[in-house]
């Protein structure tokens, strides 16, 4: 709750700037904390008070759920865009008539997908114009103040980040392929290839760069990019496949250019009858082109088996006829080529003497080295996180084995220790619940304890009649306890340190009444039962002694047991805070469900019955 004094300090402090603006209600003032304030609004506000400020224009909290969800959606859109853009390199296709054509159907499909992806970049710019930012001068302490003034947000964004987002959002391929290139002179195929080579790559770089700050924002908000380790490993593998996808597309386009370069070399030899425009499929039916093609030896000279021209690393594309194949066939072949050479660091590439080809091979080797190292490192980190607790348990088990060997424990004790460790691992999977709960706020810790323990505590008939506050106090102090088969929870005559509420498993409870000759009483207890009730009797004593009571029974687990334990100090605290535990009705209920009181009652009934029998015999 924001107090009037806080509002006064907030309006008068140096950290607050005021700007004149009409209220959302249309009058000359705004309501803040149920008070009518002057017609000025906050331009900066603490993050905790952000939701209390109502504005006419929607300003998003950079730490809020809306921005967090949008960042995830935009990250997916960016990855789709990075996948779609290299597909434009597959538009040129080599025809049997020794010419290059453009796949119209693929072109239309890619432009539609690219246009949809561009919409997300435009929305991202809109979101950036309406997202508050933390004032740099307020980062000294706490989470800082949010600047919510629209003009300041716009000014900051225009000077920082807008140009990059604007370049990434431009629909350059659509405009150039559909509008600019058809109106240019010269070969349409040559112009299209130049656009694909330069414009796509130039715009691809800022789009690729946007991935890194976007991932950083998601990590700052949640600590991770993905929620699970397997999703994180798949995310890094997908980035590696994306690099293979880009390299394969570049290799395909360069293969077509190398094949066209071979044709042009032959054309120079046949200069009298050949023109470079002949390699555009729009010129296939031209009479000069037809006569040249009939007499030309271009098909034989530019064959992969010919020694006329060195295709270098692009020889596979010509030999396998990738450049003339259908879209999906050439795409998957190029993807495999990129993945294979990226993983092998380009060791299988046999280059020619062309400088551009050698530089491309160097890029493949360098990029493969960096990306492969990052992939292995990130994959190892993500996958190890799924087995880190298992590895910790193995290390701890090794330490335990070494300690038992050093202390020369007998085999039966060693087996008991191993059995307990294994059962504890199966039950908890290495998670220390108490340690996790201690790091949470008190209110949240109480709610979790209530969720985990309330129904289990209510199974105990003794606690069924208690009110909610008393049950919450008990649940808050319950601690999980595990016992393996043949474990003695308590022995007759030993001090009772804790009261146990059985959740799962069965136990034997028996007594000899202090070792009295011929006396033996036993019973079976299971889920919903409890033991150690002597401790509750001690805690309910108005003047309890410092000496913890001794157990009147021996309790032994006959199967694996899960229980909640309430230690003596906690039980004493609950009994002192809630006087209802001292009620006569609750005491009677305790005695009714207590095995100790049942045994005493049975003994008294037996004594009374024997006395009655003896009196009857004496009277006869």
From Swiss-Prot:
<comment type="subunit">
    <text>Interacts (via N-terminus) with DMI1 (via c-terminus). The Nod factor has no effect on this interaction, implying that the complex is maintained after activation.</text>
</comment>
<feature type="transmembrane region" description="Helical">
    <location>
        <begin position="237"/>
        <end position="257"/>
    </location>
</feature>
<keyword id="KW-0406">Ion transport</keyword>
<dbReference type="GO" id="GO:0005249">
    <property type="term" value="F:voltage-gated potassium channel activity"/>
</dbReference>
<dbReference type="Pfam" id="PF00520">
    <property type="entry name" value="Ion_trans"/>
</dbReference>
<feature type="transmembrane region" description="Helical">
    <location>
        <begin position="356"/>
        <end position="376"/>
    </location>
</feature>
<keyword id="KW-1071">Ligand-gated ion channel</keyword>
<comment type="function">
    <text>Cyclic nucleotide-gated channel involved in the establishment of both rhizobial and mycorrhizal associations. Required for full activation of nuclear-localized Ca(2+) oscillations by Nod and Myc factors. Simultaneous activation of the K(+)-permeable channel DMI1 and the Ca(2+) channel CNGC15 can give rise to sustained Ca(2+) oscillations. May function during fertilization in both female and male gametophytic Ca(2+) signaling.</text>
</comment>
<dbReference type="InterPro" id="IPR005821">
    <property type="entry name" value="Ion_trans_dom"/>
</dbReference>
<dbReference type="GO" id="GO:0009877">
    <property type="term" value="P:nodulation"/>
</dbReference>
<dbReference type="InterPro" id="IPR018490">
    <property type="entry name" value="cNMP-bd_dom_sf"/>
</dbReference>
<feature type="transmembrane region" description="Helical">
    <location>
        <begin position="73"/>
        <end position="93"/>
    </location>
</feature>
<keyword id="KW-0539">Nucleus</keyword>
<feature type="transmembrane region" description="Helical">
    <location>
        <begin position="102"/>
        <end position="122"/>
    </location>
</feature>
<keyword id="KW-0407">Ion channel</keyword>
<keyword id="KW-0812">Transmembrane</keyword>
<dbReference type="InterPro" id="IPR014710">
    <property type="entry name" value="RmlC-like_jellyroll"/>
</dbReference>
<dbReference type="InterPro" id="IPR000595">
    <property type="entry name" value="cNMP-bd_dom"/>
</dbReference>
<feature type="transmembrane region" description="Helical">
    <location>
        <begin position="161"/>
        <end position="181"/>
    </location>
</feature>
<protein>
    <recommendedName>
        <fullName>Protein CNGC15b</fullName>
    </recommendedName>
</protein>
<feature type="transmembrane region" description="Helical">
    <location>
        <begin position="198"/>
        <end position="218"/>
    </location>
</feature>
<dbReference type="GO" id="GO:0005262">
    <property type="term" value="F:calcium channel activity"/>
</dbReference>
<comment type="similarity">
    <text>Belongs to the cyclic nucleotide-gated cation channel (TC 1.A.1.5) family.</text>
</comment>
<keyword id="KW-0813">Transport</keyword>
<dbReference type="InterPro" id="IPR003938">
    <property type="entry name" value="K_chnl_volt-dep_EAG/ELK/ERG"/>
</dbReference>
<keyword id="KW-1133">Transmembrane helix</keyword>
<keyword id="KW-0472">Membrane</keyword>
<feature type="binding site">
    <location>
        <begin position="462"/>
        <end position="559"/>
    </location>
    <ligand>
        <name>a nucleoside 3',5'-cyclic phosphate</name>
    </ligand>
</feature>
<dbReference type="GO" id="GO:0031965">
    <property type="term" value="C:nuclear membrane"/>
</dbReference>
<dbReference type="GO" id="GO:0044325">
    <property type="term" value="F:transmembrane transporter binding"/>
</dbReference>
<dbReference type="GO" id="GO:0036377">
    <property type="term" value="P:arbuscular mycorrhizal association"/>
</dbReference>
<dbReference type="Pfam" id="PF00027">
    <property type="entry name" value="cNMP_binding"/>
</dbReference>
């Amino acid at each position: 709750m924001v107090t009037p004094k806080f509002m006064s300090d907030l309006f008068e402090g140096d950290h607050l700037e005021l700007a004149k603006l009409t209220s959302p209600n249309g009058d000359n003032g705004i309501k803040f904390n149920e008070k009518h304030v002057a017609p000025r609004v906050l331009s900066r506000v603490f993050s905790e008070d952000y939701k209390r400020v109502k504005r006419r224009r929607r300003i998003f909290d950079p730490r809020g759920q809306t921005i967090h969800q949008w960042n995830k959606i935009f990250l997916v859109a960016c990855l789709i865009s990075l996948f779609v853009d290299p597909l434009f390199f597959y538009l040129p296709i080599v025809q049997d008539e020794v010419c290059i054509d453009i796949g119209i159907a693929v072109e239309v499909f890619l432009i539609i997908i690219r246009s949809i992806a561009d919409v997300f970049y435009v929305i991202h710019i809109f979101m950036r114009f309406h997202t508050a930012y933390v004032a740099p001068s307020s980062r000294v302490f706490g989470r800082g103040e949010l600047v919510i003034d629209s003009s300041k947000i716009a000014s900051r964004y225009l000077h920082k980040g807008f140009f990059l987002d604007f370049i990434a959002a431009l629909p350059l391929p659509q405009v150039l392929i559909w509008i600019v290139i058809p109106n240019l002179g010269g070969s349409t195929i040559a112009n299209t290839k130049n656009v694909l080579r330069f414009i796509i790559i130039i715009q691809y770089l800022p789009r690729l760069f946007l991935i890194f700050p976007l991932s950083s924002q998601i990590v700052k908000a949640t600590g991770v990019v993905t929620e699970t380790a397997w999703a994180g490993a798949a995310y890094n593998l997908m980035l590696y496949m994306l690099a293979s996808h880009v390299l394969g597309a570049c290799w395909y386009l360069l293969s077509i250019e190398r094949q066209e370069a071979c044709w042009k070399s032959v054309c120079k030899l046949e200069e009298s009858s050949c023109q470079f425009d002949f390699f555009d499929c729009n010129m296939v039916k031209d009479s000069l082109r037809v006569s040249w093609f009939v007499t030309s030896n271009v098909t034989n000279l530019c064959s992969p088996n010919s020694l006329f021209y060195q295709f270098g690393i692009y020889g596979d594309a010509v030999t396998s006829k990738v450049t003339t194949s259908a879209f999906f066939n050439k795409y998957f072949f190029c993807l495999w080529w990129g993945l294979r050479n990226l993983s092998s660091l380009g060791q299988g590439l046999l280059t020619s003497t062309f400088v551009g080809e050698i530089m491309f091979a160097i890029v493949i080797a360098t990029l493969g080295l960096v990306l492969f190292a990052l992939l292995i490192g990130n994959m190892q980190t993500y996958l190890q996180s799924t087995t880190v607790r298992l590895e910790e348990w193995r290390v701890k088990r090794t330490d335990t084995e070494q300690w038992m060997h050093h202390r020369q424990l007998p085999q039966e004790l060693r087996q008991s220790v191993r059995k307990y460790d294994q059962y504890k691992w199966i039950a908890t999977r290495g998670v220390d619940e108490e340690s996790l709960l201690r790091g949470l706020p008190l209110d949240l810790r109480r709610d979790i304890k209530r969720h985990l323990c309330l129904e289990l505590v209510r199974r105990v008939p003794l606690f069924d009649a208690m009110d909610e506050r008393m049950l919450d106090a008990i649940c808050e102090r319950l601690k999980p306890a595990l016992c393996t088969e043949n474990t003695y929870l308590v022995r007759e005559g030993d001090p009772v340190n804790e009261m146990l509420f059985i959740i799962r498993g069965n136990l034997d409870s028996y007594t000899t009444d202090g070792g009295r000759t011929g006396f033996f009483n036993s019973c079976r207890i299971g889920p919903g039962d409890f033991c150690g009730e002597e401790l509750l009797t001690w805690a309910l004593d108005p003047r309890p002694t410092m000496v913890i009571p001794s157990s009147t029974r021996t309790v032994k687990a006959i199967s694996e047991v899960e229980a909640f334990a309430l230690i003596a100090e906690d039980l004493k605290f609950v009994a002192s805070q809630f006087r209802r535990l001292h009620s006569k009705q609750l005491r009677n209920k305790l005695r009714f469900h207590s095995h100790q009181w049942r045994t005493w009652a049975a003994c008294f009934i037996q004594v009374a019955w024997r006395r009655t029998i003896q009196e009857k015999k004496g009277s006869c």
